Amino acid sequence: MFVVLFVLTLILLYAVFVVWAERKVAAFIQDRLGPMEVGPYGMLQTIADLIKLLQKEDIIATGANRFLFRLAPVLIFTAIFAGFATLPFAPDLIGSKADVGVFFMITIVSLDVVGIFLAGWASNNKFSILGAFRAIAQVISYEIPLTLSILAVVLICQTLDLQEISFQQGIYFVNKQELNTSLFGITSLGIDVNKIGGFVSWNAFKYPFLLLAYVVFFIASLAECNRAPFDIPEGESELVSGFHTEYTGFRFAILFLAEYAMMLLVAFLGVVLFFGSWNTALPNIGSLHFADWTSGTPGTIAGYAWGLFWLISKGITVVFLQLVMRWTYPRLRVDQLMNLCWKILLPLSLFLVIVSGVWVVWMKI
């Protein structure tokens, strides 16, 4: 119950902050100030907008399927919220420890597209249903390279448990499976990355080809979130607002919150798989035990605090990169989007899976 309340509070506070941050990022890139009037530096603008949004009239179109129209936003948010259940927030802080956490996460990330289709179809609006069709085609296409990029990590780590993957990238890893913990998997170097800790022990640095896997993961996750430059399902110039054209008031707020929650979820997932999860970024250097000093002991208050700090810091950094991407790159056409997926990302992700398999076999020789 504590984790449920913690995640819900985290999502709400994050949404308030990131909506303001997105406006400021957009303003900076477009050489303007952004919100400045409500609160210091406009920091309370999101609260004001939320109050205004909740006062809006709840309108349901005459021809809409009222039951499914109401159900869709709840289904979308619930699917995304459930994804946080198996995320490790600290060494001993996880909603539900699952041995197949990676599989659960891949499944749950895909479920929100069902709600998107219901939202588009139940609205009985041509723009909404076209947006829903685009979202389905996009998500199904990008699900494949996304899953393959994750599979590359799973092959290396030899587990589907997200908490175990987290431990493998830090100083508290107990090597029960006799995994190769040498830098680049080369035992002759004599460098045990788990003793050094910090960024040196992260998957993306321990196995350099996984940096390329993360690039595939990041691009595919943007498409999963329907974020620019992959926001074709919501193309304002073509579809008004896509699948949520007919939504107003509180239900629109739920859809808006779900989109930002999805951004945070895939950011956290990428951090857990590639960038050390809740482990510190600072390595031990000689007598300077930065990793030890900035990790805390698992099961203690310091362990929880440091774990949350590092995971949230890394996650927010990725979200910031997502925001910059939106205001930097133009929206792709549908054919460009599909070409990128099927002709570039899919072959690249397949190649990375093969490299991971060969790497694992080579490390055991």
From Swiss-Prot:
Keywords for this protein: Cell inner membrane, Cell membrane, Membrane, NAD, Quinone, Translocase, Transmembrane, Transmembrane helix, Ubiquinone
Reactions the enzyme catalyzes: a quinone + NADH + 5 H(+)(in) = a quinol + NAD(+) + 4 H(+)(out)
Membrane topology per record: Multi-pass membrane protein
Primary localisation category: membrane
EC number: 7.1.1.-
GO biological process: aerobic respiration
Top-level taxonomic group: Bacteria
Pfam families: NADHdh
Subcellular location: Cell inner membrane
Keyword Transmembrane part of the UniProt annotation: yes
InterPro entries: NADH_UbQ_OxRdtase_su1/FPO, NADH_UbQ_OxRdtase_su1_CS
Oligomeric and partner information: NDH-1 is composed of 14 different subunits. Subunits NuoA, H, J, K, L, M, N constitute the membrane sector of the complex.
Database matches in PANTHER family: NADH DEHYDROGENASE SUBUNIT 1, NADH-UBIQUINONE OXIDOREDUCTASE CHAIN 1
Assigned protein family: Belongs to the complex I subunit 1 family.
Protein name as annotated: NADH-quinone oxidoreductase subunit H 2
Gene source species: Cytophaga hutchinsonii (strain ATCC 33406 / DSM 1761 / CIP 103989 / NBRC 15051 / NCIMB 9469 / D465)
